[in-house]
Amino acid sequence: MLTRRSVFKPDGLKKLDFEYVPPRLPHREEYVERLVDFLRPIIERPGAISERVLITGRSGTGKTVTAKKTGEIMERIARNRGKKLIYAHVNCRATGSKFALVQRIIHQVAPALPVRGYGPIELLHALWDYLNEHDCFLLLTLDEIDYYIRTTGEDIVYELTRLTDEVKNVPQRINFIFISRNGGFLNVLSPSTLSKFRPQERFDFPPYNELQLRDILAERVKEAFNENCVSEEIIDFIARNTCKYGHGDARYAIQLLLAAGLIADRDGYPMVIPEHVREAQEKTDPRLRDEDIVVLNEHQKLLLLALARSLADRKEAVFLPIEEVEEAYNVVCEEYSKQPVGRVMLHALASELKAAGIIVIDSNFRLGLDGVKAEVMERFLENLLGKGR
């Protein structure tokens, strides 16, 4: 009897949200420490200089969460020292105009300030006046700044950064963290904007590797899922798929984990199984096309059908030994009145399917499926091959 108890803890879904900032950031703690060290003068010598940092890296490399964690720590340090520091984080992709960008900044820093009836430049000066009147300092992250400049222009960025320079003999109230996929957008800035914008420090974030993704997923599983609902094998499965298909994107990995958990709940399972991950991947980022299967030769299709059936029967398995798949293959060949190939040729067929990106093979030559549910693959192949005898 399948239980209807959720695999998630009561607040588990929040712990898998992209906006969530976990207590620990595996494999990004060093970057947080370096950022805090670089930005520490904001607190130790407030107003002496406007600090500007650029963080670059592909999607899912931890740029946003690292900036937010840095902001949390900087606010805490300032509070403990009796200083007023506000951290604000604006995703520029969600702002389609200069006004919308400034409005989002003000909403986080001084929500009581009226914004209607004013232009973006007037609002920037109102923000500056607010910071001066309240003796506050601002650490502002402009996330996806490259997208904003490409689609909206550089004017407001110039005005923001110029604001800290044009008023002399007063504390520099605004400090910046800029986040971008890469630093290429700097090359398209006008000389006047670049002179104001140019960061003093740059941090380049590499993609996560498989071991690092395992650590990240393991932490999220502890926070989000009930005990024994996600096995180490499932964590390894998602980490490996993320490296193979998601290019080390931690967001992709967490998205797969969340989707697989929701599928487990939908089907009434007490734990996440490989089929849930395969279905989640199929929905999140489908990899296999019908034509990829249609063009296979006859025995490749028969072997693939044998693997799909075996995995559908063994829902808890990520991989199956080649010997077990060979037994199923022999049964399938008998069903379709075909002479099975020998073991050497069977290994060659499996290697060909792997090279085509249709199956995966681990270091022990166990076979598995990625990107599609075993049951879906089984039905498709049975329709393609027709009914056996």
Q: What spans do the regions from the language model cover?
A:
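A short, basic N-terminal segment
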Residues: 1-50, 73
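Walker A/P-loop nucleotide-binding motif
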Residues: 46-71
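Conserved catalytic segments around the Walker B and adjacent sensor/switch elements
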Residues: 53, 77-94
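AAA+ ATPase "lid" subdomain C-terminal helix
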Residues: 243-249, 258-271, 311-314, 355
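Conserved C-terminal helix/linker of AAA+ ATPases
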Residues: 263-288
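Short alpha-helical segments that sit at the start of domains
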Residues: 286-318
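Terminal-proximal interaction/regulatory segments of ATP-powered molecular machines
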Residues: 311-389
